[in-house]
């Protein structure tokens, strides 16, 4: 508006000002009048940005659309209904979960010295042994595979208690029960994979880590450059259908001692060996840490 007024005033002072001011007046009108602004500025800008953004794969769309919101939606919107929150039943521990919290967790906490762990840059061997023998790494795994099958609430209580004594130990127990491949195997693994890995994970014979974070993209799964290309290759003397992996990961918790890696990458099938689809988006593979080509850097 100010620009239009200045242009009109200058037009009375000099004809040349009018000639130069007309384009400025027209531009101002386009900016001020909403339908014109939408037609000439907003829509073209949105279209240009949309063309520049990478497309979302079906896998990524499923991840974005999965799940529902709970009471926390009201909290983030700034208008929480506390009466609704208070009406929700408070979760309770089972007798087995409470006993574990009162006994095994208390015993573990009594063994921990965070300053010693910090100075040694590692958990003491006897602490690791106790964690493995008493099922701290298999809280999420069903009992038929040797796990404890604890509820999410119980796991939260266990980790909170351990963290009050040693954050390092708590994180070491958290990863196998959250980012570890246990839950992925339960939902998507074959029976052969479940029988192969879940008992070992529950007993602590297998130590997992989850390879998501990359040096370039951080933990933004949609931006990771790591790839797996479907192809035929030689494995143990036979030609098999598999994946040729190319990845670089960083800041992977437990990686230096892990025996199995849950690896996140983007899968491609340029030769259509699996079907007509070429890009499959983000997926995961279970990879032994000792597999040829896997290089784990020092801590």
PLM regions with names:
Residues 2-15:
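Hydrophobic transmembrane alpha-helices
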Residues 4-6, 21-176, 183, 188-207, ...:
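Amphipathic, small/basic residue-rich leader segments at the start of a protein or domain
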Residues 12-24:
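Hydrophobic alpha-helical transmembrane segments
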Residues 146-151, 178-182, 216-220, 251-254, ...:
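Flexible loop/turn segments at secondary-structure boundaries
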Residues 207-212, 244-245, 293-297:
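Short Pro/Gly-enriched beta-strand edge/turn motifs at strand-loop
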Residues 209-230:
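A gly/ser-rich beta-alpha-beta helix-loop segment of oxidoreductase catalytic cores
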Residues 229-233, 267:
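Short beta-strand micro-motifs enriched in acidic
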Residues 238-294:
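A short core secondary-structure module
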């Amino acid at each position: 508006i100010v620009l239009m007024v200045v242009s009109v005033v200058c037009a009375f002072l000099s004809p040349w000002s009018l000639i130069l001011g007309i384009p400025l007046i027209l531009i101002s009108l386009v900016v001020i009048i909403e339908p014109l602004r939408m037609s000439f500025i907003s829509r073209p800008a949105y279209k240009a940005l949309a063309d520049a953004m990478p497309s979302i794969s079906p896998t990524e769309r499923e991840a974005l659309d999965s799940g529902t919101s709970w009471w926390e939606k009201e909290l983030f919107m700034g208008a929480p209904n506390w009466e609704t929150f208070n009406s929700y039943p408070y979760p309770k521990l089972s007798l087995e979960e409470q006993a574990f919290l009162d006994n095994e967790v208390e015993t573990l906490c009594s063994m921990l010295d965070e300053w010693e762990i910090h100075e040694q840059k590692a958990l003491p061997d006897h602490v690791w042994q106790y964690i493995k023998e008493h099922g701290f790494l298999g809280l999420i795994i069903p009992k038929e595979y040797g796990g404890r099958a604890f509820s999410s609430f119980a796991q939260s209580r266990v980790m909170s208690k351990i963290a009050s004594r040693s954050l390092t130990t708590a994180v070491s127990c958290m990863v196998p029960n959250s980012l570890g491949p246990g839950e992925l195997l339960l939902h998507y693994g074959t029976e052969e994979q479940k029988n192969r890995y879940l008992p070992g994970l529950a007993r602590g014979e297998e130590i997992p880590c989850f390879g998501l974070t990359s040096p370039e993209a951080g933990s933004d799964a949609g931006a990771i450059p790591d790839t797996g290309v479907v192809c035929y290759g030689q494995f143990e003397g036979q030609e098999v259908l598999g994946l040729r992996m190319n990845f670089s990961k960083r800041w992977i918790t437990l990686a230096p001692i892990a025996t199995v890696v849950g690896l996140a990458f983007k899968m491609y099938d340029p030769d259509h060996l699996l079907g007509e689809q070429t890009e499959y988006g983000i997926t995961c593979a279970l990879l032994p840490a000792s597999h040829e080509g896997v290089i784990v850097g020092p801590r």
